Amino acid sequence: MEKEILLEVNHLSKKFGDQTILKDISLTLRKSEVIVIIGPSGCGKSTFLRCLNGLESVSGGDIILEGQKISDGSMPHAELCQKIGMVFQSYDLFPHMTVMENITLAPLQVQHRNKEEVFKEAIKMLSRIGLSDKENAYPRELSGGQKQRIAMIRALIMKPDIMLFDEVTASLDPEMVREVLDVVMELAKEGMTMVIVSHEMQFARAVADRILFFDKGLIAEEGTPDAIFDNPQNPRTKQFLHSFTYEN
């Protein structure tokens, strides 16, 4: 039995002035499904994620979340961000706040949850990712990998239905990439519904239920990880994947 559809995208388009960034994008995302989007820089991957959680308006088409159309702006953005969480490649932690203050700000001020319960949950989540000793640290005292894991917790503590990850390892040193990807992999095992933009091909293959290859604002090809990586049908997909291997 197929799981319920959480998100539907129907013929989505996005323009900036005369430039078309996304062209006729359609997909469905089911509960606990992990979709990984791959593709060259500038093909619309990040813009697509920003459309999903309302950071960018759409030029055409519909986005439907749990049966409710959200692409028309009818859902308040604060409410939408509680349902669809997002982690960016640039961390975006508040530099003047401690780790604990960064994590607990939104659930306390936006969701008006019980302070004691929120702090207890934050401590538990910090312990889970091995950063329980950093609750009183400031962002400047953390490594890039630690900042990114804190950014993930800050989004997850809002209890979103869907998580979006936009190239979360792009600005990290190679040694820090694994510690961040391990957290995402663990979320997948626990059934978190996710859409992930990534250039980490081995990770994409391991974590995804479905791979989408974006090119020039279109879904040029989609399929299971095995289908995309072992037997791509689109010549452009083959060319892109070949760029990740070096043959002398």
Q: What role is predicted for each listed range?
A:
Residues 4-216, 220-225:
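ABC family nucleotide-binding domain
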